[in-house]
Amino acid sequence: MSIRERLLATVSKYIAAYNEFDPSAMKTVRTPTCLTHGVAPTCKFTQSMEEHTRHMMLSRGVFRSVNASIVDDNITVVDEVSRQVVVKVKIRCETTVGPYENEAMFIMAMNEEGALVDEIFQFLDTARFRQFQGRLEEAQ
């Protein structure tokens, strides 16, 4: 398997684990030192693997199902040298306050073998995310 194929296979495994919305599934595709970064100006954060796991556990009370998919393989960017992949993702969720949909760009940096995600940068559509947060606040 070429490095490009390995990187794309890792992205597919990550998306599948993301859809399970289970911290143990996410741990199978990430290095123990993997960092998650929210990079939108109004939604900046950095989470260690432990922090990301805690966040997922808390969020499971809100999200009943998660379905993320790559929007268009033709705009996926693979940098074999730096072991990075950029994908545009559509996210559809069923939540305690009804449906939630968003789009995001994921920049995923893999380990040397290309088999595990070592760092991920997420850029969400913050307007949609803020609307969803407002619905959650109204429901409380």
UniProtKB/Swiss-Prot annotation:
- Which domain of life does the protein's organism represent? Eukaryota
> Could you tell me the Gene Ontology terms of the biological process aspect for this record?
terpenoid biosynthetic process
S-S pairs: none
Pathway(s) per entry: Secondary metabolite biosynthesis; terpenoid biosynthesis
State how it assembles: Homodimer.
Query: Which family does the record claim for this protein?
Result: Belongs to the trt14 isomerase family.
Q: What does this protein do?
A: Part of the gene cluster B that mediates the biosynthesis of austinol and dehydroaustinol, two fungal meroterpenoids. The first step of the pathway is the synthesis of 3,5-dimethylorsellinic acid by the polyketide synthase ausA. 3,5-dimethylorsellinic acid is then prenylated by the polyprenyl transferase ausN. Further epoxidation by the FAD-dependent monooxygenase ausM and cyclization by the probable terpene cyclase ausL lead to the formation of protoaustinoid A.
Q: Please tell me what else the database record remarks about this protein.
A: In A.calidoustus, the austinoid gene cluster lies on a contiguous DNA region, while clusters from E.nidulans and P.brasilianum are split in their respective genomes. Genetic rearrangements provoked variability among the clusters and E.nidulans produces the least number of austionoid derivatives with the end products austinol and dehydroaustinol, while P.brasilianum can produce until acetoxydehydroaustin, and A.calidoustus produces the highest number of identified derivatives.
Q: What is this protein called?
A: Austinoid biosynthesis clusters protein S
**Source organism:** Emericella nidulans (strain FGSC A4 / ATCC 38163 / CBS 112.46 / NRRL 194 / M139)
